[in-house]
Amino acid sequence: MSMLTIGGKSFQSRLLLGTGKYPSFDIQKEAVAVSESDILTFAVRRMNIFEASQPNFLEQLDLSKYTLLPNTAGASTAEEAVRIARLAKASGLCDMIKVEVIGCSRSLLPDPVETLKASEQLLEEGFIVLPYTSDDVVLARKLEELGVHAIMPGASPIGSGQGILNPLNLSFIIEQAKVPVIVDAGIGSPKDAAYAMELGADGVLLNTAVSGADDPVKMARAMKLAVEAGRLSYEAGRIPLKQYGTASSPGEGLPV
């Protein structure tokens, strides 16, 4: 299976894993290990990165094994997102940032205008920018024209578990993109993750599907296998859909 490359950095795993809302640090740590993810994302606002006296999941990890992807969750304007990104960079953990600017507190859908503004500013400041966006094909193109390093369209609303609601739009985004497309948000099961990869996505980012499962550790392994299977299927090339059946056995020797 080919490697994932973002901003000049290559990764073996195409599964990006979120680190929020696990039942315990121990379960979180085990799920991360089982997933074999190379990239872990976390909300800067929820991590006590400058508070040594407060519990911090990052302290439980061997950070030499992972690339950290801070996100700007909680931001509702470009200015807030930029401020959070600068805070993450000041911690010295990573220069990659997932831009997340929410425009609707109920649906948790991203604000397209503020996402564009934040992405443009952070690119000017030298960040490796991965914006979370909707499945709007034109918006994805405009983000790429800005120079972002990956596009992260949502499959469905964050944490909804509804899976891929608009595979056609995702296919259009994947087809036009010259940067990696990471399907982000709404993944509910390994089936959804495999489907995203079969569509040609370069990776999948998920959190709640694992952290909210009855057994997060088992689900983390299931997601790992699903992403691998979906990518291998895409690279192998599926058979075309046909209206009628085609025999797989040879026709020679059959009675006429």
From Swiss-Prot:
Keyword Cytoplasm: yes
UniProt EC number: 2.8.1.10
Outcome reported for the amino acid change (mutating E100A): Activity reduced 38-fold
Cellular location(s): Cytoplasm
General function of this protein: Catalyzes the rearrangement of 1-deoxy-D-xylulose 5-phosphate (DXP) to produce the thiazole phosphate moiety of thiamine. Sulfur is provided by the thiocarboxylate moiety of the carrier protein ThiS. In vitro, sulfur can be provided by H(2)S.
GO CC annotations on file: 2-iminoacetate synthase complex; cytoplasm
Catalytic activity annotation: [ThiS sulfur-carrier protein]-C-terminal-Gly-aminoethanethioate + 2-iminoacetate + 1-deoxy-D-xylulose 5-phosphate = [ThiS sulfur-carrier protein]-C-terminal Gly-Gly + 2-[(2R,5Z)-2-carboxy-4-methylthiazol-5(2H)-ylidene]ethyl phosphate + 2 H2O + H(+)
Record: residues binding 1-deoxy-D-xylulose 5-phosphate: G159, A185, G186, N207, T208
Subunit relationships: Homotetramer. Forms heterodimers with either ThiH or ThiS.
One Pfam family here: ThiG
Protein name: Thiazole synthase
GO terms of biological process kind: thiamine biosynthetic process; thiamine diphosphate biosynthetic process
Family note: Belongs to the ThiG family.
